Amino acid sequence: MKKFILLAVLFLFLAIPTVPSTAVGIGVSREPLGAFKITAYHGSQVKGRKQAVTASGKIAAAGRTIAVDPRVIPMGTVVEIEGIGTRIAEDTGKDIKGKWIDLYATSLHEARKFGVKRKQVYIVKGG
C-alpha cells in the first residue's frame, strides 16, 4: 500500500507543469533566435566529394548537420528549427552569413528541392 501511495504522489508531482512554456523536455529549454533563412546543401556541392567533411571535422549527416555563421550560432550548438527539427551546428560556409542556416541534405536533388524557407530558430539548452 505504501508503494502505491508513493507512486501516486510521484505521478502527481511529475504531472504538475514546472518547466517554462518554451521547454522541449524536462530540464531542456529553448532560447529564441528569431527568423532565419533556411536552405540546404549536399556533399556533392563541396568540391566534388562524396562525403562532406564539416568545418568541425565530422562527416556531414542529413538530419543532423547544419552550416551556420559561427558568430550567430557557435559551432556545436544544438538548435531547433520550426517544422524541421533539432540539428547541430557542425559546419560553416563562406557565403553563410548572419541569420542563415544551410541544412545538410541526403542528395543534391533533395537540397535543390528544399528551396529557400524562412523559419523560427531556437537554441536548445540543458538536458
Task: State what each model feature region is.
Residues 2-4, 19-127:
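Solvent-exposed, well-ordered loop and adjacent helix/strand elements within mature globular domains
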Residues 8-16:
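Bacterial N-terminal signal peptides
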